[in-house]
Amino acid sequence: MARLQEHYQTVVKKALLEKFQYGNVMEIPRLEKIVINMGVGEASQDRKLIEGALTDMTAISGQKPIITRAKKSIAAFKLREQMIVGCKVTLRRDRMFEFLDRLVTIALPRVRDFRGVSAKSFDGRGNYNMGLKEQIVFPEIDYDRVDKVRGMDITICTSAKSDEEAKALLEGFAMPFMK
């Protein structure tokens, strides 16, 4: 069992139960999945760029990402239908908890001028979205082998009904929100 998963079972669940007074233990919010998306728009012109993104994403997440393709053609972006535009990976269970642990304890503190993540990035349904400007904050990425600095979007999906509950859940995992 992952360290953060154990922490959730022993500490976070009890704290949430006391704070929100749930009638049933199944109502307590939990993490459902984490989706990491890396947009590589330049891959539509140069096919080799997606390979670097796939390698980085595999190292960060621990599983093979799927390639995302354009749903429709957009002439302004020189984009045709089914062209490669990025890659994404969906993490669940142990890998999800291990990734969140590495994100909170290692990657976020390595971000330049980091003051905390925004508390306004909840979507109203208990999910949290954030972006990282560079993939080199993760220790799995070798700085010398990076062909291009790419950012990524991270979506943390929870079973929480409200943003307040989701924020309390993520604070239980030591997510560093801005004051």
UniProtKB/Swiss-Prot annotation:
SUPFAM superfamilies: RL5-like (SSF55282). Keywords: Ribonucleoprotein, Ribosomal protein, RNA-binding, rRNA-binding, tRNA-binding. One of its GO terms (cellular component) is ribosome. One of its GO terms (biological process) is translation. The keyword Transmembrane does not apply. GO terms for molecular function: rRNA binding; structural constituent of ribosome; tRNA binding. PROSITE patterns: RIBOSOMAL_L5 (PS00358). HAMAP family: Ribosomal_uL5_B. Part of the 50S ribosomal subunit; part of the 5S rRNA/L5/L18/L25 subcomplex. Contacts the 5S rRNA and the P site tRNA. Forms a bridge to the 30S subunit in the 70S ribosome. This is one of the proteins that bind and probably mediate the attachment of the 5S RNA into the large ribosomal subunit, where it forms part of the central protuberance. In the 70S ribosome it contacts protein S13 of the 30S subunit (bridge B1b), connecting the 2 subunits; this bridge is implicated in subunit movement. Contacts the P site tRNA; the 5S rRNA and some of its associated proteins might help stabilize positioning of ribosome-bound tRNAs. Belongs to the universal ribosomal protein uL5 family. This is Large ribosomal subunit protein uL5. It comes from Rhodospirillum rubrum (strain ATCC 11170 / ATH 1.1.1 / DSM 467 / LMG 4362 / NCIMB 8255 / S1).
